[in-house]
Amino acid sequence: MVILGIDPGYALLGYGIVETDTVNSKAIDYGVIETNVGEPFPERLERLYLGMRQLIELYKPDKIAFEELFFAKNTKTALLVGAARGVAILAAQRCSKPLYEYTPM
């Protein structure tokens, strides 16, 4: 089974690909989808969407796991990350694979 894990962000969206069976797990790939600070926000969201689609097409995950948002201080940042997370969830949903959400704790 191949699992794609996502740590949402709008500047950097982290990902990890793990292959697992009933006994062993192995890291296949990890990294970030990076957006340019100088780009308009809609273009940054598009870059995240296309990057997610590329990961999904390349690794064909069986399941996709998202870290839930955990913010207490900066409302603006939470809204921007929430938008990026929504775009990533949309990209994942389009591949018709099960989506799971986990807290960062």
Question: Residue locations for each model-derived region?
Answer:
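Phosphate- and other anionic-substrate recognition elements at nucleic-acid/protein interfaces
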Residues: 1-105
